[in-house]
Amino acid sequence: MLDKLKVINGKLTAGEKPVRLFGLSTHGIAWYPEYICEESFNALKKDWRTNCIRIAMYTDEFRGYCKDGNKQHLKELIEKGVVIAEKLDMYVIVDWHVLCDQDPMKYIDEAEEFFSDMSKRFANKTNVIYEICNEPNCSGTWDKITEYADRIIPIIRSNSPDALIVTGTSTWSQDIHCALEKPLKWDNVMYSLHFYAATHKGTLRSRLERCIEAGLPVFINEFNLCEASGKGDIDIDEANAWYEVIDRLGLSCISWCLSNSGDTCGVFTQNCTKLSGWTDEDIKTSGKIIKGWFEAFADEENTNEQCFRIDK
């Protein structure tokens, strides 16, 4: 059983020792359910040397949970992923993927039911992280997120009192400064920062550094090296600048995404249908760079207290 995750003095710890989590996020599981399998998760741990997987479940678009999705099937996929991750000693993020719905309060009733069910199912699993809203935006202001969190977090805590909870921030999880100015009242909570290197540059990095210096617990639970649309060219210079900050600050980071989509952000080429055994020819340029980041994190010396070492 993995150590419980806990935020201590603004830093993520496991067994009260500093820890860094890193890995890939799935695409929406209604789009790409095939990657929720032991074969893929094991390859990500052994070949990509990751220690965390994020399971993204859209709430609104494309068979979203709150629209036209099969709720029972989506929950079964999540549970399958959690069980596999536990078997492989990987942490797993259950992501309520707010995006087109903008304001997390739009589907508050469904969210309450979902997190009540999930936190009961996974009450005794120390590897589960609850991400309560992916990317609030536009009408999804920090005040709305706070209102939402104040309803969802007590539900999770009633069943999984020690679980780590991650909340999105406004403007597609870029406004971490709003959380710094007006943090949630709950313990063991981290705040999401998302970046796409070709779009989000020095201004957002400076904001991140200021918030970390002030003690805000930040989890980069979605990033890529391309544009925020998931398309376009990657920006190598900006990617390197982001890597330097992430590595220096010892931050946890999850990359979007585990798929063979035609977008730049999908790590595999479109003609790659493998679920493991991926070669360099199967992986897009951005995926190769991100894989290199994860390998570097895993290679950190034991003396680096920010590194979480996994079995090789």
From Swiss-Prot:
It comes from the Bacteria. The active site is at residues 135, 222. One of its GO terms (molecular function) is cellulase activity. The keyword Hydrolase applies. Its EC number is 3.2.1.4. GO terms for biological process: cellulose catabolic process. Optimum pH is 7. Optimum temperature is 40 degrees Celsius. Keywords: Carbohydrate metabolism, Cellulose degradation, Glycosidase, Hydrolase, Polysaccharide degradation. It catalyses: Endohydrolysis of (1->4)-beta-D-glucosidic linkages in cellulose, lichenin and cereal beta-D-glucans. InterPro entries: Glyco_hydro_5, Glyco_hydro_5_CS, Glycoside_hydrolase_SF. Belongs to the glycosyl hydrolase 5 (cellulase A) family. This is Endoglucanase 4. It comes from Ruminococcus albus.
